[in-house]
From Swiss-Prot:
<feature type="binding site">
    <location>
        <position position="151"/>
    </location>
    <ligand>
        <name>S-adenosyl-L-methionine</name>
    </ligand>
</feature>
<keyword id="KW-0808">Transferase</keyword>
<keyword id="KW-0489">Methyltransferase</keyword>
<protein>
    <recommendedName>
        <fullName>Ribosomal protein L11 methyltransferase</fullName>
        <ecNumber>2.1.1.-</ecNumber>
    </recommendedName>
</protein>
<feature type="binding site">
    <location>
        <position position="194"/>
    </location>
    <ligand>
        <name>S-adenosyl-L-methionine</name>
    </ligand>
</feature>
<keyword id="KW-0949">S-adenosyl-L-methionine</keyword>
<feature type="binding site">
    <location>
        <position position="172"/>
    </location>
    <ligand>
        <name>S-adenosyl-L-methionine</name>
    </ligand>
</feature>
<dbReference type="Pfam" id="PF06325">
    <property type="entry name" value="PrmA"/>
</dbReference>
<keyword id="KW-0963">Cytoplasm</keyword>
<dbReference type="GO" id="GO:0032259">
    <property type="term" value="P:methylation"/>
</dbReference>
<feature type="binding site">
    <location>
        <position position="245"/>
    </location>
    <ligand>
        <name>S-adenosyl-L-methionine</name>
    </ligand>
</feature>
<comment type="similarity">
    <text>Belongs to the methyltransferase superfamily. PrmA family.</text>
</comment>
<dbReference type="GO" id="GO:0016279">
    <property type="term" value="F:protein-lysine N-methyltransferase activity"/>
</dbReference>
<dbReference type="InterPro" id="IPR029063">
    <property type="entry name" value="SAM-dependent_MTases_sf"/>
</dbReference>
<dbReference type="InterPro" id="IPR004498">
    <property type="entry name" value="Ribosomal_PrmA_MeTrfase"/>
</dbReference>
<dbReference type="InterPro" id="IPR050078">
    <property type="entry name" value="Ribosomal_L11_MeTrfase_PrmA"/>
</dbReference>
<comment type="function">
    <text>Methylates ribosomal protein L11.</text>
</comment>
Amino acid sequence: MSWLSLTFKVGSDYVDSVSDQLLEQGALSVDVHDAGEGTDHEQPLFGEPGALPEQFWQQAEVTVLLEENTDVDEIVQAVARVMGISALPDYQLTQVVEQDWVRLTQAQFEPIKISSRLWVVPSWHDLPDPAAINLRLDPGLAFGTGSHPTTQLCLGWLDKFLKPGDSVLDYGCGSGILAIAALKLGADRVMGVDIDPNAITASLENARNNLCDLDKLSFTTALSFSGGGDPADTRQHPVFVVVANILANPLIMLAPVLMSALQPGGRIVLSGILETQADEVLQIYSEWFDMQIAAKDQGWVLLAGRKSVNRTS
């Protein structure tokens, strides 16, 4: 079995209408990404809450998956009509052959060495170091397989600075990787929070797969957390370490929440922040924390600091 893949470029004004037209004509999928990706013309759009980015890239590349027997000329002509031109100036057509997609996907994920004692290992791989702390994580419903620089920055900080017996809040837990790592590294009480219920489901599954003690590790939605409905409510039992690997704008908005969850003298770790955004985040958090850029990787930064011992709220 095989399919056809049709790729062409469109301006931002036509992305919606072209995509709708393609789906109406039977496209199996429509993928839209930055036509300048990987070049000096790349235009990052993060879609962060609180930000107002352009809806689409100025120039987008559209890739359409079609049934093998599709009349491609008809598709191309329909796209041209939507764009108000007589013909598409350029497009590429390739054949997509049936493959073992599971094996192909698995091949993209290799064990990741965070430190001499900490690894992230997909479940289908043998353990490179059975004596190490091995986090078994597979790609799934939520962010956090260990491959992204921000996840590795946070794992590296936990590996170096987390003390046995610490209490930890992982805000924006995604797959639960940081919360699970904290527990494995000796934390006594860990709570993961996420806005997405799917992330809570994924985190619990990953915690069970890693044989975590669920009496010490819990996950809850941000709604339950902010409403105080969780028995591990940090307003009653503030933690010593808060780690949040999200994005800059949500971190700015969450500053009072994260501050109130932390004990006086406690430590805060933030990532998901581009180098160009670091000063803005530092300025907001400096009201409560002695913060600094603690690490950098591939244009991303990790901010770390302590809450003033004189601040209780």
